[in-house]
Amino acid sequence: MSTTQNSREVAYRLFAAEFEDATLSYSAGDDERAPNYVVTPTGERINRLFTVGALTAVESVTDDLRRGRIADPTGVFVTYAGQYQPTAASFLEQATPPMFVALTGKARTYQPEDSDQVLTSARPEDLTAVDTDTRDRWAVSAAQATLRRIG
């Protein structure tokens, strides 16, 4: 395999409002390992995202599954961590909101069975506590990335 095939997808910096408004997703192939993408309203094809914000809530969905809400200046990212994300699940179990966190994760959309609404979430690859300066720098870089996408 070539290096390109083994490299990770870029983790895009985007605000929650853009991600929350995404309603289209697709798979790049029929193989179960084919990358899945969320298409944002700006037309960006996102497999992975990077966000920094305030972890405002952590909930136990089941014994093995935690849901975290990460707020940025425009909205909220939702992340779920369970048995396949043990480090992130442990982080969420021990976290004491509110606190600033950085999240790198896989972008996903899903549609509840009883709804026509398309919801978004990020499956965490990395979840880390950060300081205010890191959050502020991320907000500036996310704004610059957004301007590049719409410019």
Question: Whereabouts are the PLM-identified features?
Answer:
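Short, conserved secondary-structure segments in the cores of folded domains
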Residues: 42-45, 91
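Extended, charge-rich, solvent-exposed interface segments
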Residues: 90-100, 113-151
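OB/S1-fold single-stranded nucleic-acid-binding modules
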Residues: 1-43
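A general secondary-structure signal for short beta-strands and their flanking turns/coil
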Residues: 46-48, 63-65, 100, 117
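OB-fold (S1/OB) nucleic-acid-binding surfaces
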Residues: 60-85
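Short, conserved beta-turn/loop elements at beta-strand boundaries and strand-helix junctions
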Residues: 58-63, 112, 132
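Intrinsically disordered, low-complexity coil segments
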Residues: 26-34, 110-119
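OB-fold and OB-like beta-barrel modules that bind single-stranded nucleic acids
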Residues: 47-57, 96-109, 122-127
